[in-house]
């Protein structure tokens, strides 16, 4: 059986953020698919609550340094990487001080959503796709987990017109643990 190239675009991955259903799922799914011989790349935002020293994150200079324009402003894209030792799974982190330096993930101390969560999600999605492009790596399957990654399939569909290698091969799926009220 030929292995797939699977891209996981995750809002959270355990153990880097508190154990939520989504964070645990992304970790276990990435690990299980890699153990079955698939080639995977897993991405998540580098939130300010992630201890870079404890988790041994380091910047990947050759992938960092590009600027992404969000709402008419330039924002530097920084790529960091770490491995989950017990799983031998590598995680790529999309980082930017304007969007991800704060200690909370999606809500402030009053439990209100950050006003710029939409911009943060756009930056994350574009950062993932630009990094995959820089890696010269073409996924056959794209898994998007939670709403922070929800725009990735739209970007993929729009970008497929310019990337014939992805047109016939790439399939995407979306999973959300959010409740709608």
Tell me what each language-model feature is:
Residues 1-181:
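Catalytic cores of nucleotide-sugar-dependent glycosyltransferases that transfer UDP/GDP/TDP-activated
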